[in-house]
Amino acid sequence: MRKTVIAGNWKMNLSEKEALSLAHSIKEKIPAISKGRISMIFPSTLHLAGVAKILQGTEILVGAQNVYPSGLAAFTGETSPEQLKELGVKVVMIGHSERRQFLGETNSFCNEKIHFLLKNDFIVLYCVGETLMERESGKTFEVISSQIREGLKGIHSHSFSNLILAYEPVWAIGTGKVATPAQAQEVHFFIRKEIAGLFLGAKEIAESISILYGGSVKPDNIQTLLKEKDLDGGLVGGASQKIDTYAGLF
Ligand code: G3H
């Protein structure tokens, strides 16, 4: 039985006051939040400490949107997993399309980060997805295949229990244009097939890993999406920054 995971990515949004106030409101709403799901919030790095403190001891996991794969060292502007641990942060998002597109993050750098994090007992939410141009030129599966094969290269079978995947078609992010359930299902199925092909015995892992869909997810479309066989949750951007949507989404 795969776990249903709903993750909220606040990206580089909200002032400190807004982020902390949203965290307090989420805490109050926890009784209304669906049971039996894993809920995660990813505030900006600057707000991690404050949000993690507010949600400490609750069922909501607080995660980081990025990390540098090193212990404490001279990497100006970066954050070490060691520093995240101190805050009680156990989940890190890797490979979000905004980092790939605007910050030049490659599959191989994602792979380095994933190795480092899994070795240090973090849960990793690894994001993949094609751009509109890639989809329109018939490259969707080729792109996803490289992101899976290169991003997850050399990951040991026993570490997969700490991995969650997210499929986010870039053309559906923040555009209001949601992938149809059939479009999302087709790619989620493909992702599972790619994972099954990673190494001998990976078929079982592919069946048990949670794959979230991201791209304009809202309370009014999440249920339809979750009806698809290979969709196990949502990675929510815009809607996760509004408290009103929490009871319907998380
Ligand atoms: O990480 C979240 C995604 O990029 C989706 O963002 O829900 O605003 O489309 P969105």
From Swiss-Prot:
It comes from the Bacteria. It is an enzyme of class 5 (isomerase). This is Triosephosphate isomerase. Homodimer. GO terms for cellular component: cytosol. One of its GO terms (molecular function) is triose-phosphate isomerase activity. Substrate binds at N9, W10, K11, G174, S216, G237, G238. Belongs to the triosephosphate isomerase family. Its EC number is 5.3.1.1. The keyword Nucleotide-binding does not apply. InterPro entries: Aldolase_TIM, TIM_sf, TrioseP_Isoase_bac/euk, Triosephosphate_isomerase, Triosephosphate_isomerase_AS. It comes from Leptospira borgpetersenii serovar Hardjo-bovis (strain JB197). NCBIfam families: tim (TIGR00419). CDD domains: TIM.
